[in-house]
């Protein structure tokens, strides 16, 4: 793939991707986070074919992509998504908290707390790794520039922030040391894009920064297409990023497509759906598929949000609420 076609495909920030026939008699809108575009370009046609064979019905799957937290707020404010697929549970929780669009116990409706896949935060560096970036400590050196999405608008950014904080805690440090470390890290961040794909554009197209912090599936996609320009660095430890999905009941009922929406989310847990996820470097939750693709995913120490921060609710309140620790750190 040449550079022009890559920038038109991988790095294009379009708001909607349409999959299926324009004359479909049923349609779904899946509101998702920024770096699942390529996955859904393959997943959606697979589901469309599956549904056609099962029911004889032709369906259209519409996609909306952006920073996870920003997308979730759009749905809670009235964007009529039938499905929401995010990279953190809080961005689905707010659909209950703010608008009662889903039940409070939405995570109990599907396996693995409604997360068909997971990922982790890794580093993408320029070819040859000229700044010799090997682990988290290297990111706070004064001559290193780091690109991270905005933790206020992006789940990707939240995970990068929490992964850095957790790295210090896992080494035996305390919260004061972790805050100092993360403060130094964000002093090295020249720009905060609203989502993960925007951060990719900043790093890969605008050539800003020595390292990009983003999800494993995103760095492998970039490496696959532009392998002669970048290297992937796996830190010694990182965070487990879960990718939950849910039917947005209120809107699906309104659109009279609840059964279709439920089948769509369940297809993420099917062997076919899990295969597509693994091929896009999303870690499968179904054991048989995970074992098949075991060699594709680096075995590194991963900690969950609950392990270090107690829960997502606590992490959100302490770190990302207005005036909380991230705001204090970034204003310094």
Regions found by a protein language model. Give the residues of each.
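Bacterial N-terminal signal peptides that target proteins for export
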Residues: 1-10
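N-terminal signal peptide c-region/cleavage motif recognized by signal peptidases
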Residues: 19-21
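Early extracytoplasmic/lumenal segment of secretory-pathway proteins
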Residues: 24-98, 108-110, 215
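Alpha-to-beta junction loops
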Residues: 78-84, 143-144, 206-211
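A conserved helix-loop-strand patch within extracytoplasmic ligand-binding domains
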Residues: 96-170
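A bilobed periplasmic-binding-protein/Venus flytrap-type ligand-binding module shared by bacterial periplasmic
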Residues: 120-129, 242-259, 276-280
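Ligand-binding pocket segment of bilobal, Venus flytrap-like solute-binding proteins
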Residues: 171-237
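Extracellular/periplasmic juxtamembrane helices and adjacent flexible linkers that interface
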Residues: 252-332
């Amino acid at each position: 793939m040449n550079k022009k076609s890559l920038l038109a495909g991988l790095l294009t920030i379009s708001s909607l991707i349409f999959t299926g026939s324009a004359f479909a008699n049923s349609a779904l809108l899946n509101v998702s986070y920024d770096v699942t575009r390529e996955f859904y370009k393959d997943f959606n046609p697979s589901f469309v074919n599956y549904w056609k064979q099962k029911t004889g019905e032709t369906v259209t799957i519409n996609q909306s992509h952006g920073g996870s937290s920003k997308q979730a707020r759009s749905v809670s404010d009235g964007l009529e998504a039938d499905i929401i697929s995010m990279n953190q549970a809080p961005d689905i929780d707010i659909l209950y908290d703010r608008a009662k669009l889903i039940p409070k116990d939405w995570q109990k409706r599907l396996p693995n707390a409604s997360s068909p896949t997971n990922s982790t935060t890794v580093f993408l560096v320029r070819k040859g790794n000229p700044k010799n970036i090997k682990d988290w400590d290297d990111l706070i050196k004064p001559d290193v520039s780091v690109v991270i999405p905005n933790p206020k608008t992006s789940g990707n950014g939240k995970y990068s922030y929490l992964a850095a904080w957790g790295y210090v805690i896992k080494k035996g440090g305390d919260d004061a040391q972790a805050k100092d470390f993360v403060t130094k890290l964000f002093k090295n961040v020249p720009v905060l894009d609203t989502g993960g794909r925007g951060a990719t554009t900043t790093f890969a197209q605008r050539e800003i920064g020595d390292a990009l912090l983003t999800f494993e599936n995103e760095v492998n996609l970039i490496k696959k297409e532009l392998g002669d320009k970048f290297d992937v660095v796996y830190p010694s430890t990182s965070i487990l990023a879960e990718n939950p999905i849910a039917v947005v009941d209120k809107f699906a009922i309104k659109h009279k497509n609840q059964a279709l929406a439920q089948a769509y989310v369940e297809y993420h847990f099917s062997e076919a759906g899990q295969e597509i996820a693994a091929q896009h470097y999303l870690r499968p939750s179904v054991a048989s598929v995970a074992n098949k693709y075991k060699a594709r995913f680096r075995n590194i120490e991963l900690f969950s949000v609950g392990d270090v921060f107690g829960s997502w609710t606590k992490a959100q309140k302490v770190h990302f609420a207005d005036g909380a620790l991230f705001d204090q750190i970034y204003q310094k």
